[in-house]
Amino acid sequence: MVYRSFVRVLALTTVVSGWTRLDVGSITSWQVDNKASPGAQQTSPTANPSASEIESNPWAKARPYFEKPFPDLRANVPELKGLAPATSQDPLTYILDRAGEKCVDLLSRIPNVISREEVTTLVPKPPRMGVSIEPYIGIQREKFDYLLLSKHTESGTKLEEYRMVNGRPATTATALGQLSQGFTSEWLRIYPGNRSESRFRYLGQQMMDQHHVFVLGFAQIPESVRFPARFQLPGKEVAIFLQGVMWIDSRDFRILRMREDLLVPRPDIGLKKFTTTIRFGEVNIAKAGSSLWLPQEVVIEWEFKTQTVQRRHRYSDYRLYVAKAKVLPATP
């Protein structure tokens, strides 16, 4: 059994250097039950949206973009340029099963790791402000240590992610967007026990980053998602459901890239777009015993009311994390 507590947060905060600061991100906690088979149906404390919530929101009758004609799909996802469209859905189950096996294997081996993270947030200047040499209202660059803890117990495995500044958890008082996290475990979306929360479509084959890849589309099923992403606005919290595309290496069935979009825009709250693109890569860590598969870069773009914002996360120098403890003599 795998269950996930996953919250994306969009919150208006302060004004920084003349532009409104937007904190966007996710808090992610994965729990994997060692006693359940990898393909078992998930069971967990439910946090599903209510029936009234589903009926009152636009995703109730949402049509994923992978159901649209191919030219429209490619317009939604420009990264699909060069895709050879699938003529059959027969390979879908095989691809999902093999990719799921990779998730199970990685989860069993992943240790506590830490990396360097560079975060750049850009707020482009709206067109109404005219042409100028500086195309951005605000630019902010920050550096962190990004920590992924893998806790193996008799009841299961739990993945927790933290952003650190000088050895302490980052907070909004010291860093912009401290909630933008959750990327290193995003591949668990296709863990066998999680597949029932989404619909999948085999889209075809493509060359991506010099790899031959299988391309899959996915869309969350609102009534099946136990812990939907939720956007938090002043005095209001709304559920958000996602669709996307994943590019899976045809040689070893590891995810090379993932793209996630809103299942439908939310004009009722001013959220027109929220797109996350994750690029994964092989990471060789000394003393880890084998290679891992972790994010190299994450790009988030969103349009909220009148602002368009882009945030880029780059990860490097992955290494084992070992907590240090210091024994102090007893005070007389």
Question: Where are the predicted features?
Answer:
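Sec-dependent N-terminal signal peptides
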Residues: 1-31
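Structured extracytoplasmic
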Residues: 30, 35, 39-243, 250-257, ...
